[in-house]
Amino acid sequence: ANSNDDISLLYFTSGTTGEPKMVAHDFTYPLGHIITASYWHNLDEDSLHLTLADTGWGKAVWGKLYGQWIAGANVFVYDFEKFEPVDVLRMIHDYGITSFCAPPTVFRFLIREDMSKYNLSTLRYCTIAGEALNPSVYEEWLRLTGIKLMEGFGQTETTLTVATYPWLEPKPGSM
């Protein structure tokens, strides 16, 4: 790159309100995700973070890599062809995942499993994005794990825009 405003990567919007549009991000874009990782995901150098997001989705880099590495966290990357809830529970159990981010639908499927089969004691923080959170999913996850689901909102065009940070009390379904 010759300058910070050179194009670093291109993503396409989901096309929710029309045709997908190309979004260019420059080389300063990863810096915006220091907030994502350090405050929303609540990561530090002792963290092992897992985000479930397809690499074609902007969330893949802003939820898995940029801020997380800048914050010094360890990143667990899992590539799968088909989502299986037991695989996620097994990964948390086997690898000691400490921080986990996924769309609310993932948590809806996880709470349907027999979670008592897995030691999830290393998991200390969970974040969600990508769709609305059903308050009943929040309550059941909290009951089963003791962990609050912290919502966040961002877009392909931006970084994390608004979130429930560790010092805030969640209001399930408010985003």
Residue ranges and their predicted role:
Residues 1-12, 19, 42-48:
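Conserved pre-ATP/AMP-binding loop-to-beta segment of ANL
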Residues 2, 173-175:
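Short Gly/Pro-enriched turn/cap motifs at secondary-structure boundaries
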Residues 7, 13-16, 49, 92, ...:
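Conserved S/T- and glycine-rich ATP-binding loop of Class I adenylate-forming
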Residues 8-32:
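Conserved AMP-binding A3 loop
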Residues 21-24, 74-81, 150:
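Short beta-strand->loop structural element characteristic of the AMP-binding/adenylate-forming
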Residues 28, 105-108, 131-132:
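Alpha-helix/helix-capping structural signal
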Residues 31-48, 52-98, 113:
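Conserved AMP-binding/adenylation subdomain of ANL enzymes
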Residues 70, 97-101, 111-172:
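Gly/Ser/Thr-rich phosphate-binding loop
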